[in-house]
Amino acid sequence: MSLMQMDSLLSLPTAELVSIADKTRRELVPPKLELCGIINAKSGLCSEDCKFCAQSSRHKAEISTYSLKDKAEIVRAAQIAKETGAERLGIVTSGNRLTEQELDVLAQATQEINDKVGIAVCGSLGALTKNELGILKDAGLSRYHHNIETSPRFYSQIVSTHSFQQRIDTIDSAKAVGMEVCSGGIIGMGETWQDRIAMANVLKELDVDSVPINFLIPIQGTAMASLETISCNDAIRTIALFRIILGHKTIRLAAGRESVLKDFQGMAFMAGANGMMIGGYLTVGGRLVEEDHRLVKEINSLWTE
């Protein structure tokens, strides 16, 4: 889609933009809302300086910090995620790399989840090498999560300890070993609309399978604590633009959906979203699972009418 076409879309009233996005979803995406859950398997003490993240050791956010959970805890989290209706469990660890021992524990946990729980396993484990990713792929890790976070232009404004290209390199490595890829980012960090469009276009070029959209939750102690959350209207328009640009890809609502969208979460699924994270996030909680189940039932019913 050309820049002129994108500018034309940006000028549309929200209702018209949402209508185009919903038509795109109905034509290209199966009418079923996808659910996933995560486990924060290793928390805090990260050496990276991502301005938005409470887990960076360079910030003063008050969070729980702990080393990698054992295999049994991770497998149990997969069972709980399955019981809440999630089709996937994302195992998430803080930090940019894994030790050899951590990699071994995660490979064993992944294999046991596949063998005994029966839920798809994803990993968000940092900038792993192709060899490390191959080990996890052989253990049954089906999808790798590695957000690009924002546009290439804006990336250096939020992180200085690694580059945008390094994110791309890890995604390419995951694809090279045969994994699916989940990659998106955070909206509301001070980026422009053109940055959001550029981010969506990069994800389209990378041909990722799933795109999580987070909305910044300004956490005390982080470098972005003083930022205001974006408006519900801007959030809805962003979701719609991503659907129009990304076509048939899964667009998954993640952190911040409750605080930004509030009572309008249902509208996000009329604006192009077709998936969401359930059961809480890394350092902040989510809605009650029962409330999300009611929303899922209503959306699935509406989509199949």
Regions found by a protein language model. Give the residues of each.
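Flexible, acidic/Gly-rich N-terminal and inter-domain linker regions that tether
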Residues: 1-52
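Conserved, mostly hydrophobic/aromatic
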Residues: 21, 50, 91, 146, ...
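Auxiliary Fe-S-binding modules of radical SAM enzymes
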Residues: 1-15, 75, 204-305
